[in-house]
Amino acid sequence: MSLPLNNFKRALAEGKPQFGLWAALADAYVTELLATAGFDWLLIDNEHAPNDVRSTLAQLQAVAAYASHPVVRPVRSDSALIKQLLDIGAQTLLLPMIDTAEQAADAVAATRYPPQGIRGVGSALARASRWNRIPDYLNTAADELCVLVQVESVQGMENLSAIAAVDGVDGVFFGPSDLSASMGLLGKPGDASVREAIRNGIQTVLRAGKAAGVLAPDPAIAADYLEAGATFVAVGTDTGLLSRAAADLAASYKKTATMAASPKGGY
């Protein structure tokens, strides 16, 4: 039995654009459906969506047969949470609210076994090692792990060069909503000054030889960030897609019914 390859990590290293979708409905059936839609990656969100370890496990199992790569975001960058997510088989993590190089280094250390890091050894109980059926898992696991850190504050942007330079960080993801709030522009992630900060940040990350990512549901803004050099871009959320489609469908039928009930001219 072989260690699963992380083709998403390879794509980022090769600079191939990867388009993703937020999976926030916290349901394995929905996430499996999304995995058939053609996205390169899906973000299983534990920070703002009602997920836990078991629901995340179910979603990892649900998408395992498909090409869409699961990226898991814990509620915070915490070594115990990281250990649990890695043990259930997550190979790519998006770690939120990273403000300093020290925090980024701690995040990387949490994904590595000693002596390179502090990840606890429990491979006999872990789906990730296929319950010790993957030969030499302990020595090879890190080769297929992708560590993405999320920079989403003024402090993080000030420390961006140092964060991106941390060994073991594969990419930096910018969070426009929290960044805009930190800049005093709450609720304005598309503000020109926020976009300029992110464009400059993308260049900083690229100079460090790392991949840059961002959430950009607006096609024009997404195109702007891609032109700036972003590699992995989340272009929407499942909640947004469902909410808009449901509202549009209801509105279209109400409009049809209203037109049908309107008085008609005639004799």
Swiss-Prot record:
Which cofactors, by name?
A: a divalent metal cation
Q: Which Gene3D superfamilies does the entry mention? A: Phosphoenolpyruvate-binding domains
Give GO terms: molecular function aspect only.
2-dehydro-3-deoxyglucarate aldolase activity; metal ion binding
Q: Which residues cross the membrane?
A: none
Task: Return the EC number.
Answer: 4.1.2.-
Q: What Pfam families would the database entry show? A: HpcH_HpaI
- The residues the record assigns to binding a divalent metal cation are 152, 178
> Where is the site Increases basicity of active site His?
87
A single cellular component GO annotation: cytoplasm
> Which residue positions hold the site described Transition state stabilizer?
73
Name the SUPFAM superfamilies on file.
Phosphoenolpyruvate/pyruvate domain
> Residue span of the signal peptide, if any?
none
The chemistry this enzyme catalyses reads: D-glyceraldehyde + 3-hydroxypyruvate = 2-dehydro-D-galactonate; D-glyceraldehyde + 3-hydroxypyruvate = (3R,4S,5R)-3,4,5,6-tetrahydroxy-2-oxohexanoate; D-glyceraldehyde + pyruvate = 2-dehydro-3-deoxy-L-galactonate
Q: What class of enzyme is it?
A: lyase
A single Gene Ontology biological process assigned to it is: phenylacetate catabolic process
Catalytic center at which residues?
48 (proton acceptor)
Which superkingdom does the taxonomy of this entry point to?
Bacteria
Q: Which UniProt keywords apply?
A: Lyase, Metal-binding, Pyruvate
Disulfide pattern: none
The record's similarity note reads: Belongs to the HpcH/HpaI aldolase family.
Annotated function: Aldolase which can catalyze in vitro the aldolisation reaction between hydroxypyruvate (HPA) or pyruvate (PA) and D-glyceraldehyde (D-GA). The condensation of hydroxypyruvate and D-glyceraldehyde produces 2-dehydro-D-galactonate as the major product and (3R,4S,5R)-3,4,5,6-tetrahydroxy-2-oxohexanoate. The condensation of pyruvate and D-glyceraldehyde produces 2-dehydro-3-deoxy-L-galactonate.
| Protein name per the record | Hydroxypyruvate/pyruvate aldolase Bphyt_5830
